[in-house]
Amino acid sequence: MSASLLVRTACGGRAVAQRLRTVLWPITQTSVVAGLAWYLTHDVFNHPQAFFAPISAVVCMSATNVLRARRAQQMIVGVALGIVLGAGVHALLGSGPIAMGVVVFIALSVAVLCARGLVAQGLMFINQAAVSAVLVLVFASNGSVVFERLFDALVGGGLAIVFSILLFPPDPVVMLCSARADVLAAVRDILAELVNTVSDPTSAPPDWPMAAADRLHQQLNGLIEVRANAAMVARRAPRRWGVRSTVRDLDQQAVYLALLVSSVLHLARTIAGPGGDKLPTPVHAVLTDLAAGTGLADADPTAANEHAAAARATASTLQSAACGSNEVVRADIVQACVTDLQRVIERPGPSGMSA
């Protein structure tokens, strides 16, 4: 019993250490930026309440190197817009409760209408505009505080941009490959669950298709965010200009990954849906090859191609043996999954050449 507890503790400790190791460098950068922001605003420029500079730096940098520059730009623009709107409402209505409600309504409405492109992604811009407008009314008796907030936001956000774009920009190729791997892992898991369902239909929980679909869509949404951020980093960070063509190739190839997700979800619906027909024996084999090929798509493309070829042969058998409409549809979906998997395996590698 004690030995088992020690093993579990050791495994948990290794997992914690691995999790911390992956974010230790971004956290270190955030800590340095927060300290610099406080030093510049409090010690150099003598702002008595310079707390917003390190706060804005931490909000922009966070514990990950993804989306830092985007958050910094959204925060700076949002703070500036909120201060302008807050000053206008204060000049007309003062700083009473009615003015507070009006300024929040106007700030949120204008921010939603003004949000375009990079600024529109996420809620940072909208929230910062509303918060800044509120603070203008709260500190209306001390106008210098308002402009110090804008200056502190510029310092904190500016330092975040310097660190995330000029000094330590994330590697967009690594970002894209990591997000792609997460999507492939989710696809592999749902295919493996389909294999188990076909082998023993009673072993799978009734709600597993919904949970699997939620995870797939969550990972796909993450890939969409990473694609936008990777393109921005490759375009604006001088240290990453050399990988622009590779980022473009990986970004364009992501469409095949989205098609694979769609095909696999459709396949899961036909296999795990209620009232399905008895499945032919080759279905188990083709699902096994699809799951194995998806799991090896990045680690071993040659082996993944072998599994894809085996799945294609089995899919052809399913198509030729299909007689009812359900079997024909299922065989066509399996063939689409194989085709999409093949395209995903043939992605461009980090050098820009075909993997």
Curated annotation (Swiss-Prot):
Q: Where are the transmembrane segments?
A: 22-42, 44-64, 71-91, 92-112, 119-139, 150-170
Q: Which UniProt keywords apply?
A: Cell membrane, Membrane, Transmembrane, Transmembrane helix, Transport
Q: What happens when the gene is disrupted?
A: Deletion of the gene confers resistance to arylamide compounds.
Q: Where in the cell is it found?
A: Cell membrane
Please give the superkingdom of this protein's source.
Answer: Bacteria
What does the entry list under GO cellular component?
plasma membrane
Membrane topology summary: Multi-pass membrane protein
Q: What else is known?
A: Overexpression is toxic in both wild-type and mutant backgrounds.
Q: What does this protein do?
A: May be involved in the import of arylamide compounds.
Q: What is this protein called?
A: Putative arylamide transporter
